[in-house]
């Protein structure tokens, strides 16, 4: 190829003709874009554009018309030029190229969201080529066209290039699929999907959001949708395919890594290539520094280099920085995208697995463990991708550094390499210790988190039993003696590792320089250019040496997480063939469900399990029949229903099911949604049948009471509802589903007696709504048995008898006959909580209208209504995040602070750290960085002396001082790290955590009932983690980088005083960028935290209702809901880490300007006659470090603000309103109080919360010692509120309660609650031993506990357990039946020495035989005590001394049973009549 200065191609006017003088450089430049487009354009069209659908809406794309017009101008120009010059070959090629460009533009814009890369690069190359031709080509005035063609091409290419990179406004939607998404979700498509290559490199696509966020506070709705490639539903398809075909078949978690990489191998390759190219570019800088130092040094000699060489090197430094920044930010961005994809895939896989988990696998893992897999472990794997590829890049950087060092110092580099590799074993040892400590710490955190979860879930019982201090001490022991002690060890190991990594470059440089002196000291000079080039290489070498051990440790930590996730994903699943499914049987008495010789257990095959739970079961249920299952507590009634659902391990036999199933669990599972959404459960609303359903389930009256009716937000686990309301909503959900088979687990135990009868009449009776369906009911209620077509009686997991009610009741040998004979005078309908709890929005019933539905009187059945259909959206509920507005009865939205965090929060945190320790930290960090600068200044002085003298005087003296400076610098910086990350962090986190847990335990019950459990636990997990480990580390790096920048700028200003002119404008530019970025990034970070809570809450909620979800075949709907929540969080997170890249590329551009300025002023100073190569080398070696330091300071300033929010949130809880004091020293009740048990309510009124109506209104009652009082009333009358009032879970509005003549508000809560005994509605149990559950204070002996267990009919069961009193109770008492947990509550009462006992339906969940035993025990053991019995079954209080009748929160009757029954106008008489006792 020939250059233009040697050969002129324009002779004779034919400027593109290569036939005259040969093919030239400009000819190639002119033709290259055409050839590029012909090849790449055709390939991209056939492989990308042609496969897509076309939406030809030209009128909406004005850029098409503009580009078409410009291309027409170019075509006309070239055709005319071809005609004038008679040159056809090159013009024809250009004409063909422009026709191809026109065609591609026409099909491009309505088809692709982003410009075709081939077209974009074509116009860029064409623009540069025409500019180059205009600059280098001679100006021939003889041939005007020779100027016209490149000039027109130049301007037309520029227009097309600008039109091609044009991005549509953010408020415009251009494509039909985007419009559909906008209509469905309300979210605008991500600007990323419209971004061209330049916009993606510069992250300009994010600028509209940054601008909006700078001027406004961002909300979730402002965030754009997630790009389609990042959505969990799309990612899961590929993951599950590869998981099934690879990892699932193997027996090692290593294959799971393979699946994760296999899913995104193309992206992985791109990331690695980007990082390696960036490494190569980064190592150009030391060579440029050396050349600039040599250039400056040349002006101290007789042969200075031309000035343009120096300025060119300065420009090269700037361009190298810019290119390196672009590559590095793309590497980080794609790494985060890969991590986000992994997290999405793992979360969705864990969620899907949890829906299929077998009972044995589920029992071996607590809810907290599974949630940790989803939250903690997936995040660890995700975070790994940020620096994972340093494993490849690190060795490559070390090789590059040592290779460059070899060229500079010869074999001296080998000693540096030796020291480098010598440090690896040390780092590996530190990493292994760190990993071991981290694993222990994870277990400590899990234990604390699990224990805290139990405290919050059982807080009502803890307060009622006055156990706050016991649980507090246990929690603080887990926290302070285990977790914080391990945190201190981790901090010390981390500090030792930091010192090693900081000192490594000093050791390497000392070894390198020392070897150089030994080998070449007499022949070569350790000059300035060698020293600072080496120094720059040592700085580059510090990153891989520092990061490799950290990355190895992170990989090991992530491997542990992957192993845990892999173990979960490969755990046992439900046997899909356990139940054989067939279409619905439409025959009038056709078999709907049948079990033949079935044996079932809760443990899987091959496990060391006890005897099967159910044995030799033969069971048949037919269409149109009501089948009842009866038996004592723990005999297997609920297990039989679970076996019908396929949730138990089937060992033998077969289960057949015909049609769909509806299931109502014994413990109703209620979604955190509206009542209507709970009933519809993802089905379309049928107004007529919906009204029929709520009438049949006796819910109309409840809707009248609730402020928002069926649109009431029920809160987490239905906390704003009573037990009876939960049960009827669960029942209504089953009825509304219009299924073929109904499995109802003891639903009648949760309602009042008159409601019980209505439900039987409306639903289960011969004229009930479900009479045409197959209904299977487990029950302890003998009343409903009269309606049963078939009764099965269970004992010890076997069906001991079955038959119709007539058959069994007429047989003297029948077990059922014996029960009927013994309890024929008792109504055994049971209940566990019909009264409204503390969190009701309203307790006063405004109407006593009989709600007996028309369903009970009509001929309607479920069969008369069409089958239910699932909503088109597949959504259970609308609400996703706490940002949505909630109704008056819903839970309050989580408070999200906006704007800057108040300085008071920082001050409080620093005081918690200790101001003296903070002072020491600043002393150490400033001294360390100053000493580091001194190290390099000394190196500069040493090299200058060598250069001036021409040899190496006193080399070991200079080397020793250099090493000493480096050692002191590393020691001081490490001490600063130890001070802030260990001593300050532990001191502050102990104060904040302990204060918060004390405040939460002392908070009133209203706080727990208006705050979701997940939100509280988030404070004790995520926020505590940030205070423990993140905040101190962020502060450390922030101040280290800040002082580093200050010292660097000082060095640059000292070496180049003219640089001070730029400091002010650069500072304002930097500050503006920081503020511009901080506002948006801070809000995105907060939104990220807010959108994570609903994701974890949904997961926890789903784990609590697995049986219900599977029974209704709603797995796909809940999976879809989970995917939506994952994507909701990820679209915020995607914008957050993209905003980091947006900021980094702009701040690092400022850093590149600093580097350029340092180099430029150094060159300029040399050219003007003031050369100082030592100062220039020193300033440049520091300037190249400032680029990332500037970025880190901005980033960490945001990290400081976003993480200090955790302190703010903890302080918010520390400042929670508190209950009354536990103990009032001046008002301690006397020993043995209450000694009599006299209770007096004196004009007592109370409401649950402010702005709510009174639930008890002017109650005046005098209860004598040892008197037995029955408390009755309709639903919502205020019965259970009396319990809350007596225990002061709610405080009076007016009036008071006196207990043995002491006003209970005048004494401490612990003194009051510990002197009362209660058997509450909620039969809560704690994880631990039986003994710890019964007597956590350890006040009773084993003999006393056994005696109490015997009285509570639990002794025989406990004795069958392997550990006896020390047998383990699993989380929430899951390994105990509901009745057994209720009897444990009775045992606690028996162990409490008190004169007052409150029973809130103590035997609701037990069978009638056990009920009789318990009632006898209460009469015998508590005969000398005052007993208040809140009754939902009227028969349980018929032997009371007096009956207290409540209505609308007022006392309407209070007299003996006999007198009230004699008065037929009394409310008690009507209640007794409704219950069938009269």
Curated annotation (Swiss-Prot):
The chain crosses the membrane at residues 26-46, 66-85, 91-104, 117-137, 155-175, 260-280, 311-331, 388-408, 412-432, 496-516, 540-560, 911-931, 969-990, 1034-1054, 1056-1076, 1148-1168, 1173-1193. ATP 1 binds at residues 631-638. Residues 841-863 have a biased composition (Low complexity). One of its GO terms (molecular function) is ATP binding. Disruption phenotype: Cells lacking both abc2 and abc4 show sensitivity to cycloheximide (CHX) and 4-nitroquinoline oxide (4-NQO), and decreased accumulation of monochlorobimane-glutathione (MCIB-GS). InterPro entries: AAA+_ATPase, ABC1_TM_dom, ABC1_TM_sf, ABC_transporter-like_ATP-bd, ABC_transporter-like_CS, ABC_transporter_C-like, P-loop_NTPase, TMD0_ABC. ATP 2 binds at residues 1273-1280. It is a multi-pass membrane protein. SUPFAM superfamilies: ABC transporter transmembrane region, P-loop containing nucleoside triphosphate hydrolases. Residues 1-25, 86-90, 138-154, 281-310, 409-411, 517-539, 932-968, 1055, 1169-1172 are vacuolar. Glycans are attached at residues 86, 139. It holds the Pfam family ABC_membrane. It is found in: Vacuole membrane. Its EC number is 7.-.-.-. One of its GO terms (cellular component) is membrane. GO terms for biological process: cellular detoxification of cadmium ion; glutathione transmembrane import into vacuole; phytochelatin 2 import into vacuole; transmembrane transport. Keywords: ATP-binding, Detoxification, Glycoprotein, Membrane, Nucleotide-binding, Phosphoprotein, Repeat, Translocase, Transmembrane, Transmembrane helix, Transport, Vacuole. Residues 268-557, 918-1202 form the ABC transmembrane type-1 domain. Involved in vacuolar sequestration of glutathione S-conjugates. Together with abc4, required for accumulation of a red pigment (ade pigment) in the vacuole of a mutant affected in the adenine biosynthetic pathway. Belongs to the ABC transporter superfamily. ABCC family. Conjugate transporter (TC 3.A.1.208) subfamily. This is ATP-binding cassette transporter abc2. It comes from Schizosaccharomyces pombe (strain 972 / ATCC 24843). The gene is abc2.
């Amino acid at each position: 190829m020939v250059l233009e200065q040697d050969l002129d191609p324009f002779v004779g006017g034919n400027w593109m003709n290569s036939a005259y003088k040969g093919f030239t450089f400009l000819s190639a430049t002119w033709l290259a874009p055409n050839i590029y487009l012909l090849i790449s354009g055709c390939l991209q069209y056939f492989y990308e554009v042609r496969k897509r659908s076309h939406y030809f809406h030209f009128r909406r794309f004005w850029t098409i018309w503009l580009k078409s017009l410009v291309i027409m101008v170019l075509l006309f120009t070239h055709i005319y030029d071809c005609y004038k010059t008679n040159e056809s070959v090159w013009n024809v090629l250009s004409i063909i190229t422009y026709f191809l460009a026109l065609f591609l533009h026409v099909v491009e814009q309505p088809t692709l969201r982003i410009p075709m890369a081939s077209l974009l690069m074509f116009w860029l190359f064409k623009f540069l080529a025409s500019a180059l031709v205009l600059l280098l080509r001679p100006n021939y005035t003889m041939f005007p066209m020779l100027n016209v063609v490149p000039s027109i091409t130049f301007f037309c290419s520029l227009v097309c290039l600008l039109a091609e990179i044009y991005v549509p406004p953010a408020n415009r939607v251009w494509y039909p699929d985007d419009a559909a998404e906008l209509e469905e979700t309300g979210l605008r498509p991500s600007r990323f999907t419209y971004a061209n290559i330049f916009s993606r490199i510069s992250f300009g696509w994010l600028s509209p959001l940054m601008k909006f966020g700078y001027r406004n506070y961002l909300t979730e709705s402002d965030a754009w949708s997630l790009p389609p490639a990042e959505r969990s539903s799309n990612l899961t398809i590929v993951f599950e395919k590869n998981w099934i075909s690879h990892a699932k078949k193997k027996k090692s978690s290593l294959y799971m890594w393979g699946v994760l990489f296999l899913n995104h191998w193309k992206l992985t390759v791109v990331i690695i290539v980007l990082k390696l190219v960036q490494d190569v570019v980064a190592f150009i800088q030391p060579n440029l520094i050396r050349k600039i130092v040599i250039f400056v040094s040349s002006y101290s000699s007789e042969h200075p280099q031309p000035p343009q060489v120096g300025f060119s090197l300065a420009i090269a430094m700037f361009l190298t920085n810019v290119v390196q920044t672009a590559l590095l930010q793309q590497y980080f961005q794609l790494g985060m995208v890969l991590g986000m994809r992994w997290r999405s895939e793992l979360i969705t896989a864990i969620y899907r697995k949890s829906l299929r988990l077998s009972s044995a696998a589920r029992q071996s893992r607590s809810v907290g463990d599974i949630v940790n897999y989803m939250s903690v472990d997936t995040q660890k794997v995700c975070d790994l991708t940020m620096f994972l590829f340093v494993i490849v890049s690190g060795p490559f950087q070390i090789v590059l550094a040592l290779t460059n060092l070899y060229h500079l110092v010869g074999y001296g580099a080998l000693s540096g390499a030796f020291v480098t590799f010598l440090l690896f074993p040390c780092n590996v040892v530190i990493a292994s210790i760190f990993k071991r400590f981290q694993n222990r710490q994870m277990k400590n955190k899990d234990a604390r988190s699990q224990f805290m979860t139990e405290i919050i879930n059982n807080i009502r019982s803890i307060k009622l039993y006055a156990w706050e201090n016991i649980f507090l001490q246990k929690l603080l022991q887990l926290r302070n003696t285990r977790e914080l002690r391990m945190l201190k060890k981790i901090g010390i190991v981390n500090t030792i590792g930091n010192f090693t990594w900081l000192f490594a470059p000093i050791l390497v440089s000392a070894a390198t320089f020392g070897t150089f002196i030994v080998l070449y000291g007499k022949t070569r000079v350790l000059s300035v250019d060698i020293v600072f080039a080496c120094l720059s290489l040592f700085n580059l070498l510090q990153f891989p040496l520092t990061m490799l051990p950290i990355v190895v440790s992170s990989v090991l930590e992530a491997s542990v997480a992957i192993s845990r996730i892999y173990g979960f994903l490969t755990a046992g699943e439900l046997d899909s063939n356990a139940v054989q499914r067939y279409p619905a049987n439409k025959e009038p008495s056709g078999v709907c469900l049948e079990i033949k010789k079935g044996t079932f257990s809760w443990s899987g095959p091959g496990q060391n399990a006890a005897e099967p739970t159910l044995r030799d079961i033969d069971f048949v249920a037919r269409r149109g029949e009501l089948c009842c299952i009866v038996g004592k507590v723990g005999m297997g009634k609920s297990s039989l229903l679970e076996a019908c659902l396929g949730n138990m391990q089937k060992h033998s036999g077969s289960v057949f099911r015909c049609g769909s199933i509806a299931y109502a669990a014994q413990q109703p599972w209620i979604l955190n949604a509206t009542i209507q959404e709970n009933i519809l459960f993802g089905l379309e609303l049928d107004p007529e049948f919906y009204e029929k359903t709520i009438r049949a389930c006796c819910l109309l009256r409840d809707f009248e009471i609730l402020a928002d009716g069926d649109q009431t937000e029920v809160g987490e686990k239905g906390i704003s509802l009573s037990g009876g309301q939960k049960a009827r909503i669960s029942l209504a959900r089953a009825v509304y589903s219009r299924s073929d088979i109904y499995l109802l687990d003891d639903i009648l135990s949760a309602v009042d007696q008159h409601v019980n009868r209505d439900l039987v009449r409306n639903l289960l009776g011969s004229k009930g709504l479900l009479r045409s369906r197959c209904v299977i009911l487990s029950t302890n209620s003998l009343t409903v048995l009269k309606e049963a077509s078939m009764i099965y009686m269970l004992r010890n997991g076997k069906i001991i008898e079955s038959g119709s009610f007539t058959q069994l009741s007429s047989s003297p040998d029948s077990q059922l006959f014996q029960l009927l004979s013994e309890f024929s005078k008792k109504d055994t309908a049971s209940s566990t909580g019909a009264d409204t709890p503390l969190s009701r929005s309203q307790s006063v019933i405004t109407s006593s209208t009989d709600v007996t539905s028309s369903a009970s009187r009509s001929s309607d059945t479920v069969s008369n209504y069409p089958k239910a259909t699932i909503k088109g959206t597949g959504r259970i509920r609308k609400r996703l995040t706490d940002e949505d507005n909630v109704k008056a009865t819903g839970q309050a939205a989580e408070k999200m602070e906006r704007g800057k965090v108040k300085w008071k929060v920082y001050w409080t945190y620093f005081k918690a750290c200790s101001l003296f320790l903070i002072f020491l930290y600043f002393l150490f960090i400033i001294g360390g960085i100053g000493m580091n600068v001194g190290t390099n200044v000394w190196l500069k002085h040493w090299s200058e002396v060598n250069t001036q003298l021409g040899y190496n005087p006193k080399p070991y003296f200079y080397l020793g001082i250099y090493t000493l400076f480096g050692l002191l610098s590393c020691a001081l910086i490490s001490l600063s790290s130890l001070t802030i990350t260990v001593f300050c962090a532990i001191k502050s986190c102990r104060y904040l955590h302990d204060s918060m847990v004390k405040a939460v335990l002392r908070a009133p019950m209203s706080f727990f009932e208006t705050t979701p459990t997940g939100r509280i636990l988030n404070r004790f997990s995520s926020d505590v983690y940030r205070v423990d480990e993140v905040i101190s580390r962020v502060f450390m790096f922030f101040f280290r980088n800040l002082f580093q920048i200050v010292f660097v700028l000082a060095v640059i200003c000292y070496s180049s005083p003219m640089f001070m002119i730029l400091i002010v404008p650069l500072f304002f530019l930097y500050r503006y960028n920081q503020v511009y970025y901080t506002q948006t990034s801070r809000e995105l970070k907060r939104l990220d935290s807010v959108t994570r809570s609903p994701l974890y809450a949904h997961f926890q909620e789903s784990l609590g209702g697995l049986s219900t979800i599977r029974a209704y075949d709603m797995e796909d709907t809940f999976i879809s809901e989970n995917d939506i929540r994952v994507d909701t969080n990820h679209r915020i997170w995607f914008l957050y880490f993209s905003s980091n890249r947006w900021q980094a590329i702009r701040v690092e551009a400022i850093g590149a300007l600093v580097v350029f300025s340092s180099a430029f002023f150094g060159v300029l100073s040399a050219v003007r006659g003031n050369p100082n190569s030592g100062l220039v080398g020193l300033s440049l070696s520091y300037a190249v470090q400032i680029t990332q330091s500037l970025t880190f300071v901005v980033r960490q300033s945001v990290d400081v603000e976003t993480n200090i929010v955790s302190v703010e949130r903890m302080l918010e809880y520390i400042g929670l309103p508190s209950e009354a004091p536990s103990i009032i020293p001046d008002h301690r009740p006397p020993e043995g109080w209450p000694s009599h048990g006299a209770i007096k309510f004196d004009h007592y009124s109370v409401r649950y919360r402010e702005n709510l109506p009174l639930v008890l209104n002017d109650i005046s009652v005098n209860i004598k010692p040892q008197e037995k009082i029955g408390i009755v009333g309709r639903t919502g009358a205020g019965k259970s509120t009396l319990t809350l009032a007596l225990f002061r879970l709610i405080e009076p509005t007016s009036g008071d309660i006196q207990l043995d003549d002491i006003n209970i508000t005048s004494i401490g809560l612990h003194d009051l609650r510990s002197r009362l005994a209660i058997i509450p509605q909620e039969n809560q149990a704690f994880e631990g031993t039986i003994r710890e559950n019964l007597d956590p204070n350890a006040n009773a002996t084993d003999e006393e506990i056994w005696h109490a267990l015997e009285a509570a009919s639990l002794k025989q069961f406990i004795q069958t357990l392997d550990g006896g009193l020390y047998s383990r109770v699993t989380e929430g008492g899951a390994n105990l039946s509901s009745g057994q947990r209720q009897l444990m509550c009775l045992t606690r009462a028996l162990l409490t020495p008190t004169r007052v006992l409150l029973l809130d339906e103590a035997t609701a969940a037990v069978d009638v035989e056990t009920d009789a035993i318990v009632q006898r025990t209460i009469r015998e053991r508590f005969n000398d005590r005052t007993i208040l019995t809140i009754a939902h079954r009227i028969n349980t209080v018929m032997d009371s001394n007096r009956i207290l009748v409540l209505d609308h929160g007022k006392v309407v009757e209070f007299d003996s049973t006999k007198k009230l029954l004699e008065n037929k106008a009394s409310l008690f008489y009507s209640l007794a009549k409704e219950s069938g006792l009269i």
